[in-house]
Structures are given as C-alpha cells and as structure tokens.
Amino acid sequence: MNCVYIENLTAYFPNINFEEISDSNFFIIDILQNEHKHLKSLRIKPNEKILITNGQGIVAFAMMELIGKTNYKIRINKIIKQFNELPFRLGLAIGIIASKERFEFAIEKCTELGVTDIFPIISDFSQTKNINYERIKSKTIAAITQCKRSCLPQIHQPISTLELIELVTVQGSAYYFDSIILADENGIYPTSNLKNSKNIIAFIGSEGGFSERELNSFPAQTIKWNLGHRRLRAETAAILTIGILSL
C-alpha cells in the first residue's frame, strides 16, 4: 500500500470527529492535482487503497475514488493518531559530516527507524558547520512515507556538542532526555533494555569522533556503548545505535 505525504491534510476536514470515521461512515476529500503532483508520480489507480500521513501525528487510511483532469477525490475510511510511532522520545545528536550525502543518508535511515529529534552537532573535529535544512526535510518526508509513520522528526538548528549536553541534562526543559547514549569504544555492548526511559538521546561523533574536552563534558550517568571491533563510519554508527534503541 502506497503512503503519501500531505502536510495540510486536516485542512480538508477541520470539523470531523476522527473517532466516528469508519468504512461505513466515511467522507470524501477533493484535492487539486497541481497542489500534490507527487500523487501522479506514484501512478495510483482508482479504487486503490493508500495511506496518507501529514507528518504531524496523523495517518489516514484511504482509497482513491476518482482521478479527474484537475483533481483527486479520495475517500477517508479511518484516521489513526501516532501511527507506527515509538512509545518514547528518541533523539539523534550526530556530528555534521563533511559528505552531505552520507549525513543525509544517516538522517533518512534513522527517521525510518523512528527517531523523533535530530540535532546536527558541531563538534571540535567537525569539518563543516552548515546543513541544508530543506534537503534534510525532504529526506525525512521520503523516510516517513517509506516506513508509514505519522510524525516527521523535529530538525533542530546546528549546535555545539557542549551546548547540547548542557541543554539535554536540564530537567524540566523542552530539550531534556533522561537517558544519554554515547557511542564509545570503551563502553559496554549495547542493549535495548531501557524500559524506564521516556526520553533517550544518542550522541554520535563526526569524522574523528569527539575530543577529550567533549568526552569529559558528558554527565557521569551517560551510558557508553561499544559498537563492535570494526571501525564504523559516523552514519553507520548512527543507524546501528538508533536501530538497537528502536527495537
């Protein structure tokens, strides 16, 4: 079943009670083709079932009723909130990688695995400090339609490692995470058994890892994970770590 992204989905039914929608109590929305050209590229046919995500916590189970010359008529059969989302907040703090393609690949795959917050970090060894926000957002949109989830991750502005460590350790703040994972060769072997954690953030360094100054700034309760004997690229370490945490 194809999944499509329509950011303004709820604008088509502002006064609908989601709980009352069903196969026998459906409604039709009318979408202009020139506003959603990506639907045409999917070659969806009449009577084909599709999923629609708005990236803001809603997925609609739908069916293509009619493909007109200028519009689509889509039948909405059911709406589910927080579809295919993890039961906890999962952050990825990853050093900005010099290769934009590798950096964007890491973000795309970690989005598929359920990450909710992305923090591009400027570490002492970072070779670049800038990101292309629009390109990264487009990668996350592609990822949530691939894995059929309801929420886009929040992409935060680039921040230094030390500043982010300070933010995520302040209880009560919007940035607070109660568990910090650090990819480190001196750590323990990973486990996904963090049942008491409601918010987990994983720190992955860029090329060269983290400096001694940065490593010494992590709080004592930081959980260090050894990701194996082989030296991994930053994007591989990010995907592996988030994959374990999402299990």
Regions picked out by a protein language model, each given a short descriptive name:
Residues 1-81, 134, 177:
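N-terminal positively charged helical leader segments and presequences
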Residues 28-30, 87-91, 200, 218-227:
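Glycine/charged-rich beta-loop-alpha catalytic/anionic-binding loops adjacent to active sites
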Residues 155, 180-182, 222-226:
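Conserved beta-strand scaffold positions in the cores of enzyme catalytic domains, especially
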Residues 184-196:
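Strongly charged, low-complexity linkers/loops
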Residues 197-213:
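A C-terminal functional module that forms or caps the active site or interfaces directly
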